[in-house]
Regions:
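A conserved helix-loop-beta module that forms one wall/lid of the active-site cleft
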Residues: 1-24, 28-42
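A polyampholytic, Gly/Pro-enriched intrinsically disordered region
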Residues: 19-26, 310, 452-459
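Conserved mixed alpha/beta core segments that line enzyme active sites in large multi-domain catalysts
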Residues: 39-438, 455-459, 483, 490-503
Length: 505
């Protein structure tokens, strides 16, 4: 790992006179174009060549900024992270690395970043950016590069199940690059202290429905300087069955036998492959649960607060493995005491009630509700359009300095629109409370484990999950909302306003 310190960012910005365009209202593409045409200091070239020789692998170019890692209010996933393949032509690799660094610098000034600054009362020209160059963990499969396993580990579990304790933490595991996890993809959620209790694989039907079907890999053939605002421009989105030919599933997959309707641990020729990590979690091929327990213990101990850790792991055919800690950041767990007995408030007095909620404090100044139109026949096909409507409405709230309650089915902030509405944090940054609703035909795990979720908790935004499928999952009194006149209404979204402020506890 190599760090380019903030003084290089300062020199780059000043010597190329980039602040006028960076702080303007120019589009993200226009800002990136100016940054890519600018020059990095020549003094870095020799160091970069030395780094190439030392790593001889693909490189991740990550942001590490002053505000991003603040203990009191950390950002997560707002700035760009690029990856470049390893090339034998060192000068071509140097060009790609330079473009990636400039792309990370440019992302500080994109529209989403500026909206984020506004929402968090930070001043963008006070931001300082360091860049981390890190060897990408993984194996080379010819045209693609990815690790056996990536994960996000949180030492605080806001949704413990059964005999799990909140302080025992939760890990989200996936095949392939970790970008899939932080983008909100379908992962396997497991508590390191209870590796045998995985809800998603507890029943055959759940395992078939709720396990990973896609994964991300670095495209080793994508060579050139055509960098885009989307930092995933050279990331391949593959199906799990594509990994079968790479023979990378040996210790992390199970096979569904359609004739006997059972799931067998291991990879067999016939039947759908399911990413269950059973050989790792239940059969001890590698001591992953123990490693995760140790990582949480020392990570939280060093930061003196709960932490979120990104990690990756390669598992070899001889059952050896290499485990890498990639990033660690604090989880803001602000708490405020509530004296009122919420259970004593009758349901008839409530617009919505959740038995799984996160947040703190009492809010008594919100009068607006923005909600996705849904019923028991809801289809996720239109979630892209929903995201556009909500981003536009959110901009109006930001301009007016007001907040709202946001309600919708599925997982907010997922990059997979089948799992929920694919908004980014700045697109809903004026929301005071965010509600995820599980429906009969659309029952998705909550957002915990994504950068999006981390930002909700950091900024004290109320986060409620409501499961309409169980009598104990809470409720949304949607009939009240549907009967109200709309302040604004689109094909997919309604905005209504109450005469008096709601009381949010």
């Amino acid at each position: 790992t190599v760090v380019l310190c903030t003084d290089i960012f300062d020199e780059f910005m000043m010597s190329n006179n980039l602040y006028p365009i960076a702080l303007s209202d120019a589009s993200d593409d226009e800002i990136l174009k100016h940054f890519l045409h600018a020059q990095l200091p020549d003094s870095l070239i020799a160091d970069f060549f030395t780094f190439f020789e030392a790593t001889r692998s693909p490189i991740a170019i990550r942001s590490s900024s002053l505000l991003e890692d603040a203990h009191y209010q950390p950002f997560a996933g707002i700035y760009s992270t690029y990856m470049i393949p390893y090339l034998e032509d060192k000068y071509q690799m140097l060009q790609m690395l330079a473009c990636a660094i400039k792309g990370v610098y440019a992302s500080v000034f994109y529209r989403d970043s500026k909206a984020y600054m506004t929402a968090t009362s930070n001043v963008i020209d006070q931001e300082k950016m360091a860049v981390i160059l890190q060897q990408v963990v993984g194996k080379d499969y010819g045209t693609r590069f990815y690790p056996t396993m990536s994960g996000v580990l949180r030492s605080l579990n806001y949704y413990p199940i059964g005999d799990e304790e909140a302080e025992e933490g939760i890990a989200s595991l996936a095949l392939g690059l970790g970008k899939y996890i932080v983008d909100g993809g379908q992962t396997l959620r497991v508590c390191p202290y209870h590796p045998n209790q995985v809800l998603q694989t507890s029943e055959t039907e759940l395992a078939l429905r709720d396990t990973q079907t896609q994964f991300y890999a670095l495209d080793m053939k994508h060579v050139g300087n055509d960098f885009k605002v989307d930092d995933g421009f050279n990331i391949l989105k593959l199906r799990v069955k594509d990994a079968v030919e790479d023979q990378s599933l040996t210790y992390i997959a199970s096979t569904f036998d359609p004739y006997d309707q059972v799931i067998n641990d291991g990879v067999y020729e016939n039947g759908r492959k399911l990413i269950t990590f059973s050989s790792v979690l239940q059969h001890g091929v590698v001591p992953l649960p123990e490693i995760l327990q140790m990582s949480m213990k020392y990570g939280a101990g060093a930061m003196r607060r709960p932490v979120e850790i990104e990690f990756a792991c390669n598992i070899n055919n001889d059952r050896t493995c290499e485990f890498y800690l990639l990033q660690i950041r604090p989880i803001v767990d602000a708490k405020e005491m509530l004296d009122e007995d919420v259970k004593a408030i009758p349901d008839s007095d409530c617009l919505l009630r959740s038995h799984n909620s996160l947040g703190h404090g009492i809010s008594e100044d919100v009068v607006d509700v923005v909600y996705v139109k849904y019923d028991d026949h809801f289809s996720a096909m239109n979630n892209f359009y929903v995201a556009d409507d909500i981003e536009r409405i959110n901009r109006k709230f930001l301009a007016d300095g007001k907040n709202y309650v946001l309600i919708g089915p599925g997982r907010w902030g997922s990059s997979d629109h089948y799992l929920g509405v694919p908004v980014k944090w700045p697109h809903i940054s004026a929301a005071r409370v965010i509600v995820e609703v599980a429906l009969k035909n659309y029952n998705i795990d909550p957002s915990q484990g994504t950068h999006f979720f981390q930002n909700l908790t950091s900024f004290g935004v109320g986060y409620f999950t409501v499961d309409t499928n169980t009598g104990e999952g809470g409720f949304v009194n949607k009939e009240i909302l549907d009967a109200m006149p709309a302040v604004e209404e689109t094909q997919y979204v309604r905005h209504v306003r109450f005469e008096h402020p709601m009381r949010i506890l």
